[in-house]
Regions:
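N-terminal periplasmic/intermembrane-space "pro-region" immediately following the signal or transit peptide
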Residues: 1-50, 101
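Outer membrane beta-barrel
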Residues: 32-183, 194-199, 203-212, 216-218, ...
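Sequence/structural signature of outer-membrane beta-barrel proteins
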Residues: 52-58, 82-84, 121, 182-189, ...
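Solvent-exposed loop/turn segments connecting transmembrane beta-strands
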Residues: 60-63, 86-95, 156-159, 187-194, ...
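Short hydrophobic/aromatic beta-strand or adjacent loop that forms the aromatic wall/cage
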Residues: 97, 161-163, 197-199, 243-245, ...
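Outer-membrane beta-barrel "beta-signal"
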Residues: 202, 339-357
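Detector for outer-membrane/organellar transmembrane beta-barrel domains
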Residues: 203-298
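Outer membrane beta-barrel transmembrane domains
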Residues: 279-280, 285-319, 323-327
């Protein structure tokens, strides 16, 4: 009798222990699921790839090549209602952006950003290549003055830098401002001189569809290589590097158009230019695309370049498109800057995804 009672008690205790463990497991599993759900609710994933075929005829030489231009992936994490973080990597090159935002105001009036990000110089530079009409993406002036790649003194920096930004929107989002304090050396690099670069940006939307933009930069560059455009600046030299731009963007159902005037000062050399780019929707996702772009890399040496683009693009699914363009330029850099007729036919496929729970 006592033995049966002991066995019964043992079974009861064992069942109680297993029941308790099972309950704890369910709670832990439930807690884990809640944590995963919370993380998933706070993270957005994005990515895109651009690549295609280019044919170029320049200086009596024909070149044709398949080209993968960009393969980017980035993640946004909304840590709290005021704190967010972004990480971006280009699998065809390097890590391009990583920064944290803290919104001080209850609305969008004041946000501080710290990390590596696109500088606010020019209208075009902060924009994604997935929204630009040209396969070459930005205008010659923007590419040169913002450090996107055509300025040998700065190198290929993709229009990005390390630093601090303060920005916000007021007046029912009609007015937007931005102030950047940057190293001035580009991505993934320490500052190579004692000075910081200051960039200011002001946008005003007086009416629906129209945006007026003015930007400027004051700073000092540190030359990483010699430049055929400015031969009196030597590698390792610190030099004055100032810029300013004024531009506009207009969007409507019948026409999308943006343009800008740009000017830069590197040491004693002035560069300046202007561009006008737009597209006309033809229906069923097809747009007619055109652009005229003028830029003088060195006004003292008459290093002026004219560029024209004409083509079509087909948006076959949301932000996915196929582009076909003819490009004409009247100058080339091979063997030194010189004027010559250059023709190109470019075809590009763009695939993009955006995921948010």
């Amino acid at each position: 009798m006592k033995r049966k009672t002991c066995i019964s008690r043992t079974l009861a205790v064992t069942l109680a222990v297993f029941s308790s463990v099972a309950a704890m497991g369910q709670r832990e599993n439930s807690s884990g699921n809640d944590w995963l759900k919370d993380v998933a609710d706070r993270i957005q994933l994005h990515g895109y790839a651009q690549g295609g075929l280019n044919y170029t005829h320049c200086d009596a030489k024909d070149v044709n090549t398949f080209e993968l231009k960009r393969t980017l992936f980035w993640a946004n994490a909304q840590i709290t209602d005021r704190v967010s973080f972004l990480f971006m990597h280009d699998f065809s090159s390097v890590v391009q952006e990583y920064y944290m935002d803290y919104r001080f105001s209850k609305n969008k009036a004041l946000t501080v950003r710290l990390g590596q990000f696109k500088n606010g110089l020019s209208y075009e530079n902060p924009l994604s290549p997935t929204s630009m009409e040209a396969i070459d993406v930005y205008s010659e002036g923007v590419t040169y003055l913002t450090g996107c790649g055509s300025d040998p003194l700065l190198g290929v920096q993709y229009g990005r830098d390390l630093g601090l930004a303060v920005f916000g929107e007021t007046n029912d989002q009609k007015l937007r401002y931005e102030i950047d304090v940057m190293n001035g050396q580009g991505i993934n690099r320490k500052d190579q001189n004692a000075e910081k670069d200051f960039i200011g940006r002001l946008e005003y939307r007086p009416v629906k569809g129209l945006n007026l933009v003015a930007t400027g930069q004051i700073g000092r560059g540190h030359a990483v290589a010699a430049s055929p455009y400015i031969p009196d600046i030597t590698p390792g030299e610190n030099y004055k590097r100032n810029r300013w731009t004024v531009g506009f963007d207009y969007k409507s159902a019948a026409l999308n158009l943006h343009g800008e005037y740009l000017e830069g000062k590197d040491k004693n050399t002035t560069s300046r230019g202007a561009y006008l780019t737009g597209n006309v929707p033809l229906g069923k996702g097809v747009d007619l695309v055109g652009s005229y772009d003028y830029f003088n890399f060195n006004t003292d040496l008459d290093y002026d370049q004219h560029k024209a683009i004409f083509g079509v693009q087909w948006w076959f699914f949301k932000k996915n498109r196929f582009q076909l363009q003819y490009v004409y330029k009247n100058a080339a850099l091979a063997g030194g800057f010189h004027h010559t007729a250059c023709h190109a036919i470019m075809a590009q496929m763009q695939v993009r995804f955006d995921w948010a729970k």
